[in-house]
Amino acid sequence: MVNKSFVWCKIPRAGLGNQLFPIANALFFAKEKNLPIYFTHYRQFKLGPYLRRERTKRKYDNFFTFDRGLIYDIYLRILLRYKSRKMSKVKGCGSISANTVYLFDEIPSWEGYFNSIVNDREEVKKLLFQNINSDILEQVKTLSKPIFSLHIRLGDFQII
């Protein structure tokens, strides 16, 4: 019998930094288990930046190679949602079952924020860079390197 399992990364509504966690975990899991991977919910309209009249609107269209446009995203959402397969939210990197959809759709909690990727940092970094569009990478190369950058929002972490 043929194993028709695959990985589905349903990108959560969050900022780009928080979206990178399920993306990175899904990419790593799919590579480790040699499974096909599908990404949905990448194109998200965020009303807040418009209401607050922010200069940047937080649109990350075409940043990644898996972003194939809104129509394809909607088509894939419908197709994946109605597949009659067992759905499994991934909590580790254990063994895989036949005909299972491995779903990555959550941002890690504050207490284990980096636990899922810390031991495989270099591989995860490599996988992320492989999935960034070449145009974006070229733009990044032209920028001067920052000396230091830090962004912490207290809404993302519990005060200890």
Predicted regions mapped to residue ranges:
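Short helix-capping/linker segments at secondary-structure and domain boundaries
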Residues: 5, 31-37
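Short His-Asn-centered micro-motif
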Residues: 10-12, 40-41, 152
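A short, glycine/small-residue-rich beta-strand->loop->alpha-helix junction that serves as a flexible
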Residues: 11-21, 159-160
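Histidine-anchored nucleotide/phosphate-binding helix
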Residues: 20-31
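General "foldedness" signal
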Residues: 23, 34, 51-53
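A short beta-strand-loop structural module common to alpha/beta enzyme folds
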Residues: 35-45
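Secretory-pathway luminal glycosyltransferase catalytic domains
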Residues: 46-160
